[in-house]
Amino acid sequence: MDNMKKIKFAKINYSDNAEDRVMPVEQKVSDFYKYGVYNDFPEFLIYLYNNSSIHNTCINAVVEGVVGEGLVCDEEHTSMLDTANKEESWNDILKKIALDYKLYGGYALEVIWSKDRTRVSEVYHIDFSWLRAKEKTKSGKIPGYYISDEWSEKYKYGIGGGIYNQYQSAGVNIELPYLPTFNPAKKVEEPKQIYVYCPYKPGQKYYPLPDYAGALRTIEVDIETDNFHSNNLRNGLTPSLAITTFLNADPDQRMEIERMLREQYSGTNNAGSLMYIDVDSPENAPKIEPINSNGTDEYYMNLNNMVQQKILTAHRITSPMMLGIKTEGQLGGRTEVIDAYLLFTNTVLRPYQQILTQCVEDMLSYQYPSATNFSVGIQQLNLFEDGSTKTDVVTGIDAEVGEDKALETEIQKTDTEQLLNP
């Protein structure tokens, strides 16, 4: 009993506010609305993107499919796509806004009018995670956005609205760069504006949600599962062996014994090594017992399969083979891949492409006001049920009937001329 009194147990609760970060809360602080409980919801989405391999692959696959082989325009106006700003073409802009659209659910462009205000001179991409919306007007319109790449560092807010990181006092937004919402009618007094695409989402008034929002917790599970296995490999001894010594060692001696054991036997580099122990008498021999896994290997295998399927479903990828993931027990998947690709192209990629193409076409109409009757589309290879491919062009949602076919005909004509005159 006396010895038992020397043993104390403590319960340690770990909390990193992960549950709060999943919630895309919109709450007013000072003159703008924070994006997430701690004003870091976009940074949370970036964290998921960078740390979940399957989620990262899904996003990249969608973005690459959306961008396709790039923007195309009718032959007379092709040169308009070459310059969005001094450093980038419209294809460069397309790649960035396609990623933002998929990752955050929206995208933003800085629009700069010419000195004489007759046309848009330059258009730049703005990382959507940098935006925080100003409070809506009485008419329900967002007048503009504050812009910073340090929201999670300097302007992180607590649940109640108070500043979480005490870098600044209340009213920090006053010194932040601000851009009014894109409005050609105000181009004279507002030469720099911001165009923000923020589609309607139930419950969201200021910020969008990505289409995979329902799987945010599942993506976290994927990351934590990888972290669990990584730590298991690094700390090799902890989950597999119980070692009991009978030396009545003091704390310093116990720490030294633990250090020697970890140094000699833990980690992946020591897997399969021989354990040799020399003691002065049998009474002092340590007791080494394996800790049964209780089926944890099978549990985590099933968990991994469940997580993978849920993430794929959230991204509307019906077949894992589209990402190069082989399904166990499947003999052949050619037909499945073709069917899945056709569904993916028409229900996932095409809607993205139509929205982005329409945006580019609208911006070009302000950048080149004298250009009329031009068509813009995204070129891609379309896969058919028999496995054959054909050039396909997706135009904007406001495009007239036949514009896509006209662009396809021009592309085919150009390809034929290049073959005949290499």
Give the role of each language-model region:
Residues 1-59, 69, 74-279, 387-422:
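Structured, contiguous alpha/beta core segments that scaffold functional sites
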